[in-house]
């Protein structure tokens, strides 16, 4: 879900939203072995106090909340399952995963109308926010974030999960400056030959945009996440979407040509040879020849980061 972030400096909010009283079921997804105070059990949504709206889209809203007893801050993502059938898949995936490279989900509350995710609060927003603020990403910074994203993708692949929508707005940053993968609304668990095309077109790989030309196989979903990573790291370095020219209208026809037809991606001459090679391996159009996550983690551009 692409969120439209609201202004941080605003008058005190009177939130015209449903009260935090749910008669549905709840399940915790936090690790029972963790001793961190942030994993204090949340028994009910009444344990949380809404502070502000962080963002909202057609499928739901994300709130900044505070635990009434511990004062710990959380993000509360409220979705309507009847408006978006993928949210039940997202809930199932979040129950399975726990990694320091992926945003943490502490609990999910289910009611007749809403699906509510109690999430780790990422204080510095997303990579998309940083790009809008014209933050400059040096090569070492890009290398570090690429390493973290690859670590997260490796974990997901071991769990048999294709993220399916790696893009700047789904890569969140905490107060330590650590980037974590978020939003599993377009994700799927690889089984039964399901190679659907949910996700954001601009970050889709050629085989997802044009299945007839490129074909598909058991690794195609994972290879698509690698392509998306390549687009993201290059976008962070040059400060804009890298597959189209400045001034191009980002419609379907333009994106299709940029992703599937253009011979090569323009990479600035200021990039190091290591960076150019890394991006080239990510943005190989034939998914059969594209580097895997494991191969990229051994690449000199991200190794030992």
Curated annotation (Swiss-Prot):
SMART domains linked: S_TKc (SM00220)
Residue list for modification Phosphoserine: 34
Domain Protein kinase: 48-302
Enzymatic reactions: L-seryl-[protein] + ATP = O-phospho-L-seryl-[protein] + ADP + H(+); L-threonyl-[protein] + ATP = O-phospho-L-threonyl-[protein] + ADP + H(+); L-tyrosyl-[protein] + ATP = O-phospho-L-tyrosyl-[protein] + ADP + H(+)
Kinase keyword on record: yes
Location of Phosphothreonine modifications: 200
Binding, ATP: 54-62, 77
EC number: 2.7.12.2
Protein known as: Mitogen-activated protein kinase kinase 10
Highest taxon, organism lineage: Eukaryota
Pfam families for this protein: Pkinase
Active site, UniProt feature: 165 (proton acceptor)
Family in the record: Belongs to the protein kinase superfamily. STE Ser/Thr protein kinase family. MAP kinase kinase subfamily.
GO molecular function annotations of the record: ATP binding; MAP kinase kinase activity; protein serine kinase activity; protein serine/threonine kinase activity; protein tyrosine kinase activity
InterPro entries documented for this protein: Kinase-like_dom_sf, Prot_kinase_dom, Protein_kinase_ATP_BS, Ser/Thr_kinase_AS, Ser_Thr_kinase
Keyword set, alphabetical order: ATP-binding, Kinase, Nucleotide-binding, Phosphoprotein, Serine/threonine-protein kinase, Transferase
Quaternary organization: Interacts with P.syringae type III effector HopF2.
Organism: Arabidopsis thaliana (Mouse-ear cress)
């Amino acid at each position: 879900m692409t969120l439209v972030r609201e202004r941080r400096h605003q008058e005190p909010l009177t939130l015209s939203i449903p009260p935090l009283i749910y008669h549905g079921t709840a399940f915790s997804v936090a690790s029972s072995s963790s001793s961190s105070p942030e994993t204090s059990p949340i028994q009910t949504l009444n344990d949380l106090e809404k502070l502000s709206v962080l963002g909202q889209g057609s499928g739901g809203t994300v709130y900044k909340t505070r635990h009434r007893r511990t004062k710990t801050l959380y993000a509360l993502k409220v979705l309507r399952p009847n408006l978006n059938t993928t949210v039940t898949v997202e809930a199932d995936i979040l129950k399975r995963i726990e990694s320091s490279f992926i945003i943490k989900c502490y609990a999910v509350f289910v009611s007749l109308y809403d699906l509510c995710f109690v999430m780790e609060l990422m204080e510095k927003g997303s990579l998309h926010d940083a790009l809008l603020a014209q933050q400059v990403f040096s090569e070492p910074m890009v290398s570090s974030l690429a390493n973290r994203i690859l670590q997260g993708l490796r974990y997901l692949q071991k769990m048999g999960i294709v993220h399916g929508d790696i893009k700047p707005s789904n890569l969140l940053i905490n107060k330590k400056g650590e980037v974590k993968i978020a939003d599993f609304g377009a994700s799927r668990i690889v089984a039964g030959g399901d190679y659907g095309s949910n996700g954001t077109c601009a970050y889709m790989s050629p085989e997802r945009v044009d299945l007839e030309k490129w074909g598909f196989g058991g690794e195609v979903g994972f290879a698509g996440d690698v392509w998306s990573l390549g687009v993201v790291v290059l976008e962070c370095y040059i400060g804009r979407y890298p597959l189209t020219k400045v001034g191009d209208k980002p419609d379907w026809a333009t994106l299709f040509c940029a992703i599937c037809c253009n011979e090569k991606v323009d990479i600035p001459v200021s990039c190091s040879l290591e960076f150019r090679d890394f991006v080239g391996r990510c943005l190989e159009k034939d998914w059969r020849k594209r580097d895997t996550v494991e191969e990229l983690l051994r690449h000199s551009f991200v190794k030992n980061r």
